[in-house]
Curated annotation (Swiss-Prot):
GO terms for cellular component: A band; cytoplasm; PTW/PP1 phosphatase complex; stress fiber; Z disc
Subunit structure: PP1 comprises a catalytic subunit, PPP1CA, PPP1CB or PPP1CC, and one or several targeting or regulatory subunits. PPP1R12A mediates binding to myosin.
Name of this protein: Protein phosphatase 1 regulatory subunit 12A
Main function: Regulates myosin phosphatase activity.
Length: 1004
């Protein structure tokens, strides 16, 4: 029945199964399409890191790029070098991997092998042609990064063998950039190519690395100072982030936008290095002064036309600047400028001696200027007609900063000449690799607060015109104050020293021959030089020599009393609106420069003086300290007769109210997202890459903690060594004192035997050697116990535990000594009662004389023993074990003597008592003096021992705490390394799974 029921149930189950969803499924398992698709490059990198050469070959056959780089710029060869996979390194190099491929920070595979200390990989890479002089973004070669001595020796030998100049290799990038910048300046157009990933330009690289000469040339070539990369960073962002003060100053003097924000809403202040924040704020105040004066004055434009003949006799000084000077005389609020004027006069007196030599060269350079005149005039006419079709650039003070949104240079970024491409490939640390930015300073949450604080600071100051660069002159005092306080130090990359005067002269010749006459913009030094020239010429040549058109520095208006204000009206050049206004005014307001014919003599003198000022400034730079203000080089357009100096200097005026400034400066940006910014993500990836480079995943904090623990262990070792030396000295002292005591005890025993042989009977003779033997045995046992305790601390232990064991041994010996002291005190207390009996008995002896007189010999012996007691009292600095051994001998002999006396007293032999009394009385005196001094010694030594015990207990607790901390650290490090290993293993397994799935899919 049961079987039938079971079969029936089974049949019912089969009927239900037929037609069910499971039955309808096909026997072959359907493969679902994988939703996750990995990049081919990521699959290739995962295969290389796993060491699967067959898979790597298959991927290469399918067209995978062997030089594919991840987000950090690391290639498979980099990763193989970091992982110490020699086979994969050889496999990749044999299959055509670029052995000198740099990552985002300029590290080539040899850098990675050198930092990790893999000698075999480094030797193989060098044998295959790796460049030992390659420099990363921070200016480090593989030799600089190497830490192990063997690696340093290998790389140094290779550098010597190849004859590589390390310093030249470090400056190679700047040299290449200088060459390119000169070519662009001479050709008149810029062939810069943005970095493929970051979008960085040559101006970004020069600003971030502090290449000031390159920066000046690029700005002189009309490079846009506000150009942005793909993250929205301007060159000022880069210079501020990497702490390059000189680059920041040059950019601000050329009127870059200091309020420009990147893609995540950060200004240059938000990403700046902490050390230069104050300097940036000072620069912003000075730039705001320029902008505010420009806005408030809005001085009228002057147009005047005249022919060449009239210009030769008329004065050319009556132009826009003299009108502004006349307005400045009536202005009421120029007190702040008067302070700066006084400072400038003091500096001018200091520089008179250096100015005199350049003034003498003025006449010599005039003939040279006449030869260049024809070329410059022809070029100037073409440039002025070209600029008329665009928004008018500001040509003031030799500053060629494009101020309109349009770029002032043709950007031919699509095609590059083959020579340029070859040079790019050859350069080992090419600046076109770009810079990596980190968001380590200036989080998104701080942006709004920093902007509000900046608005409040800037609203209080007077704002100055954009086209009059007053920064360089007004920064002189600040630069000198900085020299007194100590120069600021940049922390990112080494600052390249300035060019010498010879190279600057070559640059000037190249610039004059190829393009419109390039004149260094007037710094405060150039302004003082011009004023000295004016004074000298006014004394020698008369008023007509004052009419030469000249470069004017930003501090114009401070010395208006020195200048002639009643000049005859003459021809002048039309002046464009300022750079600050070009952003706010409509395009129609931007007038073009209408060039007029000027005096040939004026043109000659202006070019001569301008060139002289440039040479003076370069010589000044060469002799000055590194923080001295350098002069940015920029071209000015020379007319058919006169230099068009589009100077719109404005001085005082009513300062706009803070509310107007805030309205004008209010930010209308969209609110920033709370998500992680690109710069923060890059910062985290950089940190992860640093931990990947070292195979153990050790971070900087771990290294610092390790150094601290090493320092502590060294200090404990030195302590332990000192303790061991002290113990050795104590042992030597103990041995010497024991030998002396043995000798003294033997001599005393001999004396006693000789002196008392007549009176003391045979029982006492039998007893005496036993007492001495017990005393000596007790001393030997005590000394052996102490020596064994001290020697136990000298066992072979690890260094970290020596201090603890020695402390334990010291405390053990001290405890044993304390126990011995307690026993002796108990013995003393036991003896106090018989002592009092003897004292009562003593006057009876004197009262009842038995006819036996005291020996004179006894008194002599007492004196000797007093001397010995005093000697013992002076030796209080002896160790505890020695004092205890001496104390034991005395106490044992005394106690045995007491027992013997009591036994003889009971026997009642009067004759023996009478014979024994002299010795007893002498022994009692000896006992009383010995015990007092010994008791005092023991008390003092007990106090010392208590203090030492307290110290050792404190040391012991400290050592226990340190031991617990070290064990916790080791456990924490072990856990951390395990977690990192698990993460890596899981990540690699995911990559492998994804790669295998994709390969299976392709196979299917």
């Amino acid at each position: 029945m049961k079987m039938a029921d079971a079969k029936q149930k089974r049949n019912e189950q089969l009927k239900r199964w037929i037609g069910s969803e499971t039955d309808l499924e096909p026997p072959v398992v359907k493969r679902k399409k994988t939703k996750v698709k990995f990049d081919d490059g990521a699959v290739f990198l995962a295969a290389c890191s796993s060491g699967d050469t067959e898979e790597v070959l298959r991927l290469l056959e399918r067209g995978a790029d062997i030089n594919y780089a991840n987000v950090d710029g690391l290639t498979a060869l980099h990763q193989a070098c970091i992982d110490d996979n020699v086979d994969m390194v050889k496999f990749l190099v044999e299959n055509g991997a670029n052995i000198n491929q740099p990552d985002n920070e300029g590290w080539i595979p040899l850098h990675a092998a050198a930092s990790c200390g893999y000698l075999d990989i480094a030797e193989y890479l060098i044998s295959q042609g790796a460049h030992v002089g390659a420099v990363n973004s921070e200016g480090d070669t593989p030799l600089d990064i190497a830490e192990e001595e063997a690696m340093e020796e290998l790389l140094q030998n290779e550098v010597n063998r190849q004859g590589v100049d390390i310093e030249a290799a470090r400056k190679e990038e700047e040299r290449i950039m200088l060459r390119d910048a000169r070519q662009w300046l001479n050709s008149g157009h810029i062939n810069d190519v943005r970095h493929a990933k970051s979008g960085g330009t040559a101006l970004h690289v020069a600003a971030a690395k502090g290449y000031t000469e390159v920066l000046k040339l690029l700005i002189q070539a009309r490079y846009d100072v506000n150009i942005k990369d793909y993250d929205g960073w301007t060159p000022l962002h880069a210079a501020a982030h990497w702490g390059k003060e000189e680059a920041c100053r040059i950019l601000v003097e050329n009127l870059c936008d200091m309020e420009a924000v990147n893609k995540v809403g950060q200004t240059a202040f938000d990403v700046a290095d902490e050390d230069i924040l104050g300097y940036l704020e000072e620069l912003q105040k000075k730039q705001n002064l320029l902008h505010s004066e420009k806005r408030e004055k809005k001085s009228p434009l002057i147009e005047s036309t005249a022919n060449l003949d009239n210009n030769q006799t008329q004065k050319t000084f009556k132009n826009k600047e003299t009108l502004i000077m006349e307005q400045e005389k009536n202005a009421s609020s120029i007190e702040s400028l008067e302070h700066e004027k006084a400072d400038e006069e003091e500096e001018g007196k200091k520089d008179e001696s250096s100015c005199s030599s350049e003034e003498e060269e003025d006449d010599d350079s005039e003939s040279e200027a006449e030869t260049d005149k024809a070329k410059t005039l022809a070029n100037a006419n073409t440039t002025s007609t070209q600029s008329a079709s665009m928004t008018a650039p500001s040509v003031a003070g030799g500053q060629g900063t494009p101020t309109s949104p349009l770029k002032k240079f043709p950007t031919s970024t699509t095609k590059v000449s083959p020579k340029e491409e070859e040079r790019k490939d050859e350069s080992p640390a090419s600046w076109r690799l770009g810079l990596r930015k980190t968001g380590s300073y200036g989080a998104l949450a701080e942006i709004t607060a920093s902007k509000e604080a900046q608005k409040e600071k800037d609203s209080a100051g007077v704002i100055r015109s954009a086209s009059s660069p007053r920064l360089s002159s007004s920064l002189d005092n600040k630069e000198k104050e900085k020299d007194g306080k100590g120069t600021r130090l940049a922390y990112v990359a080494p600052t390249i020293p300035r060019r010498l005067a010879s190279t600057s002269d070559i640059d000037e010749k190249e610039n004059r021959d190829s393009s419109a006459s390039s004149i260094r913009s007037g710094s405060s030094y150039a302004r003082r030089k011009w004023e000295e020239d004016v004074k000298k010429n006014s004394l020698n040549e008369g008023p007509t020599s004052l009419n030469t058109s000249y470069q004017r520095s930003g501090s114009f208006g401070r010395r208006q009393d020195d200048l002639v204000s009643s000049n005859v009206p003459s021809t002048a050049s039309t002046v464009t609106s300022s750079a600050g206004l070009q952003k706010t005014l409509p395009a129609s307001a931007n007038t073009t420069t209408k060039s007029t014919t000027g005096s040939t003599s004026a043109g000659v003198q202006s070019s001569t003086s301008n060139r002289l000022w440039a040479e003076d400034s370069t010589e000044k730079e060469k002799d000055s300290v590194p923080t001295a203000v350098t002069v940015p080089v920029a071209p000015s357009v020379v007319n058919a007769a006169a230099t068009t100096t589009a100077m719109t200097t404005a001085t005082s005026g009513t300062v706009s109210s803070t509310s107007e400034v805030r309205e004008r400066r209010r930010s209308y940006l969209t609110p920033v997202r709370d998500e992680e910014s690109e710069s923060q993500r890059k910062a985290r990836s950089r940190q992860a890459r640093q931990s990947r480079r070292s195979t153990q995943g050790v971070t900087l904090t771990d290294l610092q903690e390790a150094e601290k623990t090493i320092g502590r262990s060294r200090s404990t070792r030195t302590r332990e060594q000192e303790n061991e030396e002290k113990e050795k000295e104590e042992k030597e002292k103990q041995d010497k004192e024991k030998q002396e005591e043995k000798k003294e005890s033997e001599t005393k025993d001999d004396d006693y035997r000789q002196r008392y042989s007549r009176t003391v009977e045979e029982p006492y003779h039998r007893y005496r050697p036993t007492s001495t033997s017990t005393s000596t045995s007790s001393t030997s046992s005590l000394s052996t116990s102490t020596s064994s305790l001290s020697s136990s601390s000298q066992l072979n232990r690890p260094n970290s535990l020596i201090g603890i064991t020695s402390a334990y041994s010291r405390s053990g010996t001290k405890e044993s000594e304390r126990e011995g002291g307690k026993k002796e005190e108990e013995k003393e207390e036991d003896k106090s009662q018989p002592k009092s009996i003897r004292e009562r008995r003593r006057p009876r002896e004197k009262r009842r004389s038995t006819g036996v007189s005291f020996w004179t010999q006894d008194s002599d012996e007492n004196e000797q023993e007093h001397q010995s007691d005093s000697e013992e009292g002076t030796n209080k600095k002896e160790t505890q074990s020695d004092s205890l051994s001496r104390y034991d001998t005395g106490s044992l002999s005394v106690s045995s003597g007491d027992r013997y006396d009591s036994a003889q007293g009971r026997s009642g032999s009067q004759s023996y008592l009478e014979d024994r009394k002299p010795y007893c009385s002498r022994l009692e005196k000896e006992d009383s003096t010995d015990f007092k001094k010994l008791y005092e010694q023991i008390l003092a030594e007990n106090e010392k021992l208590k203090a030492q015990l307290h110290d050792t207990n404190m040391e012991l607790t400290d050592l226990k705490l340190q031991l617990e901390k070290t064990t916790q650290r080791q456990e924490r490090f072990a856990d951390r390394s395990l977690l990192e290993m698990e993460k890596r293993v899981s990540g690699k397994s995911q990559y492998l799974l994804g790669g295998k799935k994709s390969s299976r899919k392709k196979d299917i």
